[in-house]
Amino acid sequence: MNIRGIILEGYSNSGKTSLLRALKRYQAQDEASESSVVILGEHYSQILHNVHGKFVRLSREQHLDLLKSRVDLIKPLNDWANFLGPGRRKSRGLFFILERFHLNHRAAFPEADEIEITELEKQLCELGANCILLTLSNEKAEERIKSRNPDEWVGKPREDMEQACEDLIETQNNLRIQAAKSLVPTKEINTDRKDWNEYARLIMEDYGFA
């Protein structure tokens, strides 16, 4: 197989963007790694979008179409590499990273028919995708939420923070449930320590994605 990929899933404060940067650095420093890389952040795959200053939430069908279009961007690249035949990973290989993808969809539409998202997951598996679900310990939720935008919480009622923590914990649990249903192989990483470089090494070496 000429292609491999990582899908980063998790709540807003779990560290997806920080880990994405660390993975980019790790892959770039490996002399034998792929020269061809496709990285799509969450703005290319999430459900809620800021469109010209207004927040727009995609329907289930719209979001499925969006995810399918992203996979359809990657598949022809892999087909071309396969057409060329065997070759070194550096020259013929393709490495991709996607953020907030199939698990985000499953968690947002848990009661929907799974046929279409399962078919998409089959295609992701054929493209060598592995999913990393980033989570926090419950007791770290408040600290992580505050660390992102400290000024935002100044003067706010305590109840607002309690609700934000509940939302984080509930979303994490929902993502775990959906990961168990998904066809895409998934590993969970607790990001309490914020050791992004070590998490990247763990993914690329110890988990056998390298």
Predicted regions located by residue number:
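Hydrophobic anchor at the beta1->P-loop junction of P-loop NTPases
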Residues: 8
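P-loop (Walker A) phosphate-binding loop of NTP-binding proteins
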Residues: 11
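Conserved substrate/cofactor phosphate-moiety recognition/catalytic segment
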Residues: 21-87, 108-109
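NTP-dependent small-molecule kinase module
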Residues: 171-210
